[in-house]
Amino acid sequence: MFMINILMLIIPILLAVAFLTLVERKVLGYMQLRKGPNVVGPYGLLQPIADAIKLFIKEPLRPATSSASMFILAPIMALGLALTMWIPLPMPYPLINMNLGVLFMLAMSSLAVYSILWSGWASNSKYALIGALRAVAQTISYEVTLAIILLSVLLMSGSFTLSTLITTQEQMWLILPAWPLAMMWFISTLAETNRAPFDLTEGESELVSGFNVEYAAGPFALFFMAEYANIIMMNIFTAILFLGTSHNPHMPELYTINFTIKSLLLTMSFLWIRASYPRFRYDQLMHLLWKNFLPLTLALCMWHVSLPILTSGIPPQT
């Protein structure tokens, strides 16, 4: 029975990932005053299926000097971790309702760094290695602010369980009292998922394609799916943290519809940002984090710690 539950979670995610690639190409197309994919099927709807077939029937070549086991293991690990992070997400009911769901998600996103590092190192190519080192530095750096922002939000929620956030936000969305945190969180999620304007790992003019430059066919598709699964997951996480949907146990469908609309709008904003902004320079990317975001988030975290103590407010006990 549990296996069926897992499949019921994984299959829709993979379908969503497939069609997000199409949506991205269509949105970017319309923003550049062109049509996007419109040949394969009506409105290009069969394009993701064609892409999947093409990628998975190609021969998975690898460099002669690469480390075979690690080279193959890295993309599998990337997708595995990307799918694992969906387990504690309340939509409205999670697959496993963990007491420390937020901590679990932080741990899994930190582990994802290894798949990037291994792929760059095992490729035995200077471009892949530089891309991997950039990606790792960027991911680790932005995880610092993500963790501090999460801590501040959880101080308002009073529990590490994600389902508690739904109860916390019945009266008011947390984006209203904590809008500076929400803005920094959104920008940090962009950097964490390696999206424009923070896609330094894929700087075409410098690194060809970043850490996955030596990958082709199936393994490349796994990296691609992991990236897009992470994008959707991060937007869902943002919707849960800051745009909490009121959950009526008698009509759980309303929660799901509400929640899906918010997540889709956030995903659309990712695509909009990609179409609008040029890429950052690497030093600007690090400057933004260590000299702007980190002091601000630390100050706000101290504020959220001291406020309940000053006003004798006791957070909800669970």
Curated annotation (Swiss-Prot):
Pfam families, alphabetized: NADHdh
Catalysis: reaction(s): a ubiquinone + NADH + 5 H(+)(in) = a ubiquinol + NAD(+) + 4 H(+)(out)
Record's bilayer topology term: Multi-pass membrane protein
EC number, as in UniProt: 7.1.1.2
Segments crossing the lipid bilayer: 2-22, 70-90, 100-120, 146-166, 172-192, 222-242, 253-273, 294-314
Modified residues (N-formylmethionine): 1
Localization (cell): Mitochondrion inner membrane
Keyword annotations: Electron transport, Formylation, Membrane, Mitochondrion, Mitochondrion inner membrane, NAD, Respiratory chain, Translocase, Transmembrane, Transmembrane helix, Transport, Ubiquinone
Protein name in the entry: NADH-ubiquinone oxidoreductase chain 1
Organism annotation: Bos taurus
Name of the encoding gene: MT-ND1
